[in-house]
Amino acid sequence: MNHMERKKEQLRVEVRRAVLQAELATESEVPSVLLEAPKDKAHGDFATNIAMQLARIAKKAPRAIAEELVANFDRKQAGIEKIEIAGPGFINFFLDNGYLRELIPQVLTEKDDYGSSDVGQGEKVLIEFVSANPTGDLHLGHARGAAVGDTIANIMDKAGYKVSREYYINDAGNQIENLAASLNARYLQVLGEDQPMPEDGYHGQDIIDIAKQLVDEAGDQYRQLDEKERLAFMRDYGLKKELEKIKQDLNAYRVEFDKWFSETSLYESGQVERGLQVLKDKNETYEKDGATWLRSTAYGDDKDRVLVKQDGTYTYLTPDISYHLDKFDRGHDRLIDVLGADHHGYIPRMRAAIQALGYDPARFNVQIIQMVSLFQGGEKVKMSKRTGKAVTLRELMEEVGVDATRYFFAMRSPDTHLDFDMDLAVSKSNENPVYYIQYAHARVCSILRQGEELGIPYSANTDLSPIASEKEYELLKAIGEFPGAVAEAATKQIPQRIANYAYDLAQALHSFYNVTRVIDTENKDLSAARLALMKATQMTIKNALALLGVEAPEKM
């Protein structure tokens, strides 16, 4: 339990004691004490609506109940400086400043672990994200999904969940046959043949580049094979090269996966047939018009879904169901799928299938990633200037950098459309949020170096009593909010909570710095206390940025 959680628990105990002492309810009647951080800091550090909850039991007006509670509340015992009653009976608590100072040794002791919690209680979570078809470069939707998925994984990991990251390789469908045919055509074209592209072929530059690479490596030796053998080779070679490229781009993007799961392996292992058999054994399928159907309407879907077509082939849903069954078979307690905006209709049918398999649908969560629009020079960027095709993740990283790309994709709710301002992302100004946060970190590091050069020591045991100004306490409150922000972001899977938190913390630091002289050579005790505060700030900013996959530079 972190510092602020301990404080909240202490407050709950004291509120409960005050309720009983004021004889407003019996032991069994006292409701759970809800404590929330008010949006307006003028309303204190924590607020409770316990007076409203007690109104029916105590048969009194909430405000009168609040007044009785405050009269019976031991502020000193709870570490509260003052209490205010607001509106119809909300009780606002303002923390004692001495208690806030205790945050500094906690952060300095926990270091990289500051912000961690056991909210997840070791729950095993599998997050599947990106999972782009290995038939071309990663585009902006994949880029946003990668940033969101990885950030959620980082946050949940810090909050005590056991997280696994997985990429599902779609290597068993028609798209792979089209990849093979496209690469075959480009290979023969590079060798000088007048070979037409297949009707559903891929026309991207990446296929041409792979064909040229193959010619450089092997010349025309594959032209000698019969077409069936050559297409089989092209399938494997093209898939290998596309995956290599995807892995390189994601590695540069600071995204790594614990497992790359092949769709083909589902067929080779018999898992697809097994998933279908499980549904049949549970009487969740039926035969009609020569096809096998899933009774998905029984679980909220708008219509039943075909699993096996009349010709005996599977629909795309069948291997997907078996894949999710496999995820549960591997011991995961919860599944999170990060999917593109075009997958809205997929959710109810997969949730229905999971229920049909016998699992609680609450164990299946979906994070939808909405579309991204790029803007540069005030105009929408529709195509890459270099290739004339859609802008890729690689190009965006080259244009604005990994840090800005990751932060911008995480700073808004994933299920809302994002306008990505490329000019803002590279600007060295306070309007650029990632620059603003990184500059705060670099500024603190500069102060710490200055203190080191002057030989002013500080540690977790430094006397912190000289810390007494309003700006110092505002900064401490911002630092203290980090564990709660991580816990909330993890339980609700809202990565933007951490992006916004990092910005708010940077804002508190800049506001403090603008009116405060950290190092005073005439007052070593004050300087040491403030340097300890700066170190706690630096560690917290760094930890927040790490969750976002963003670097924390020491110099800028």
Curated annotation (Swiss-Prot):
Pfam families documented for this protein: Arg_tRNA_synt_N (PF03485), DALR_1 (PF05746), tRNA-synt_1d (PF00750)
The reaction(s) catalysed by this protein are: tRNA(Arg) + L-arginine + ATP = L-arginyl-tRNA(Arg) + AMP + diphosphate
One GO cellular component term of this record is: cytoplasm
Keywords recorded for this protein, A-Z? Aminoacyl-tRNA synthetase, ATP-binding, Cytoplasm, Ligase, Nucleotide-binding, Protein biosynthesis
What is one process in the GO biological process aspect for this record?
arginyl-tRNA aminoacylation
Q: Which SUPFAM superfamilies match?
A: Anticodon-binding domain of a subclass of class I aminoacyl-tRNA synthetases (SSF47323), Arginyl-tRNA synthetase (ArgRS), N-terminal 'additional' domain (SSF55190), Nucleotidylyl transferase (SSF52374)
User: In chain numbering, where does the motif 'HIGH' region fall?
Assistant: 132-142
Which enzyme type, at the first EC level? ligase
Q: Which HAMAP family match?
A: Arg_tRNA_synth (MF_00123)
> Protein name, please?
Arginine--tRNA ligase
Query: What is the originating organism of this protein?
Result: Shouchella clausii (strain KSM-K16)
